[in-house]
């Protein structure tokens, strides 16, 4: 059902005669003007713009990202977004499903963060990981200690799989103690000691 706005206008009869009209009782050949005022109202109707509340099923350039709720014009939705399968009308059932999905995602994020915190605690309580390398002159070692070396040691000692891409290790070419960082989660970083000694 369309919504309408109305504007009322007042209008008098013929603007050429003003507020006068020719009398029907005047004899032939003569014209008698009789003053007459008649007002009536004209209602102008205009359709208001229809807006649809939608949810995007995929990223739409210059409009929004997948899962975003927004208001768009009905024609844009009907002629572009709907045929392309990019959006759907928001219903109470859909809102309920979205809320359940958001709660599930939040619970999963919380669980992953807690696991990362527990793993960080394990790494930090271990103390240090010992690496042996063939010694050279003074404190120098042959080769270097890499992130992959640390990952292999963690797997051997703690039976934990760690991706070498999360390991940040300074360049190690001498014996001594170094600190490595493991980015286990965007909000959780574990710092571990790497103790390098010569054979």
Swiss-Prot record:
Q: What is its main location?
A: plastid
InterPro entries associated with the record: Ribosomal_bL9 (IPR000244), Ribosomal_bL9/RNase_H1_N (IPR009027), Ribosomal_bL9_bac/chp (IPR020594), Ribosomal_bL9_C (IPR020069), Ribosomal_bL9_C_sf (IPR036791), Ribosomal_bL9_N (IPR020070), Ribosomal_bL9_N_sf (IPR036935)
Q: Is-annotated flag, keyword Plastid?
A: yes
Subcellular localization: Plastid, Chloroplast
Q: Which GO terms describe its cellular component?
A: chloroplast; ribonucleoprotein complex; ribosome
Q: Is the keyword Plastid in the record?
A: yes
Query: What single Pfam family name could you report for this chain, choosing any that match?
Result: Ribosomal_L9_C
Q: Where is the transit peptide?
A: 1-44
Q: Which UniProt keywords apply?
A: Chloroplast, Plastid, Ribonucleoprotein, Ribosomal protein, RNA-binding, rRNA-binding, Transit peptide
NCBIfam families given in the database record: L9
| Complex formation | Part of the 50S ribosomal subunit.
Q: Which family does it belong to?
A: Belongs to the bacterial ribosomal protein bL9 family.
The record, for HAMAP family, names: Ribosomal_bL9
What is the recorded name of this protein?
Large ribosomal subunit protein bL9c
